[in-house]
Amino acid sequence: MSYYVCVQLVNDVCHEWAERSDLLSLPEGSGLQIGGMLLLLSATAWGIQQIARLLLNR
């Protein structure tokens, strides 16, 4: 749910409003960065699993 808050008050009259949200808001472009980090984490875990499987099967 979003709502508006006054960000500039002059003589008890609001001159500028800003929209706010109760949801987690991320900065512009951070979604790709987070997705990339999750992909890197998954690839690292897969690589460690492959190395462990290679070493344990000897």
From Swiss-Prot:
<protein>
    <recommendedName>
        <fullName>6.4 kDa protein</fullName>
    </recommendedName>
</protein>
